[in-house]
């Protein structure tokens, strides 16, 4: 039995209907869009979590009806993912020896590459570019500003 409230179900239905509308109005949402759908509902799943819950990389492999999306949403929302931003902020603070909210650009890059989903040096560069991150005269960055900009998203997808 579902633990979702009527409001939650209605919210999922609205987002589902929007995705269905873009996808041909056939009552289905492609499994490749599951991550995007969850993100529209305020979640921040990793690609790995999306795939664990039935998301696919390629369009056309699988599709879901609303009744099949609800349990995915419910399971994902019940997992307290403790936000990724909190995890990154804690990691950044360990490098902030003087407690001034600043760490070196190199240390930020290391944290970005080690925590969460592994990213490449190029992806780090993209993050710095899209977030308009600039180092101070000592090569340091205000990591709280970086996190605010990253969490605000969205970023251009260069993988297409």
From Swiss-Prot:
Task: Tell me a Gene Ontology molecular-function term this record carries.
Answer: calcium ion binding
Check the record and name the Gene3D superfamilies matching this protein: EF-hand
By its UniProt entry, which InterPro entries does this protein fall under?
A: CALM/Myosin/TropC-like, EF-hand-dom_pair, EF_hand_dom
Q: Which residues does this entry mark as bearing Blocked amino end (Xaa)?
A: 1
The protein's matches in CDD domains, at most eight in alphabetical order, are given as:
EFh
- One Pfam family named in its UniProt record: EF-hand_6
A single cellular component GO annotation: muscle myosin complex
Cleavable signal peptide:
none
Q: Which residues form the EF-hand domain?
A: 7-44, 83-118, 119-153
Swiss-Prot/TrEMBL keywords = Motor protein, Muscle protein, Myosin, Repeat
Summarize the protein's role.
Answer: In molluscan muscle, calcium regulation is associated with myosin rather than with actin. Muscle myosin contains two types of light chains: the catalytic light chain, essential for ATPase activity, and the regulatory light chain, a calcium-binding protein responsible for Ca(2+) dependent binding and Ca(2+) dependent Mg-ATPase activity.
Name the record gives this protein: Myosin catalytic light chain LC-1, mantle muscle
Q: What is the lineage of its organism?
A: Eukaryota, Metazoa, Spiralia, Lophotrochozoa, Mollusca
């Amino acid at each position: 039995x579902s633990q979702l409230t009527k409001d939650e179900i209605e919210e999922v239905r609205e987002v589902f209907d929007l995705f269905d509308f873009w996808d041909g109005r056939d009552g289905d949402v492609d499994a490749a869009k599951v991550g995007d759908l969850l993100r529209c509902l305020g979640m921040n799943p990793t690609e790995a979590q999306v795939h664990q819950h039935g998301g696919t990389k390629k369009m056309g492999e699988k599709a879901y009806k609303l009744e099949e999306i609800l349990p995915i949403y419910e399971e994902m929302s019940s997992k307290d993912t403790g936000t990724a931003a909190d995890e990154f902020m804690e990691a950044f603070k360990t490098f902030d020896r003087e407690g001034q909210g600043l760490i070196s650009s190199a240390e930020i890059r290391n944290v970005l590459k080690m925590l969460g989903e592994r990213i490449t040096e190029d992806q780090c560069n993209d993050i710095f570019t899209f977030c308009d991150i600039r180092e101070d005269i000592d090569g340091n960055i205000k990591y709280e500003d970086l996190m605010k900009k990253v969490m605000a998203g969205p970023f251009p997808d260069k993988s297409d």
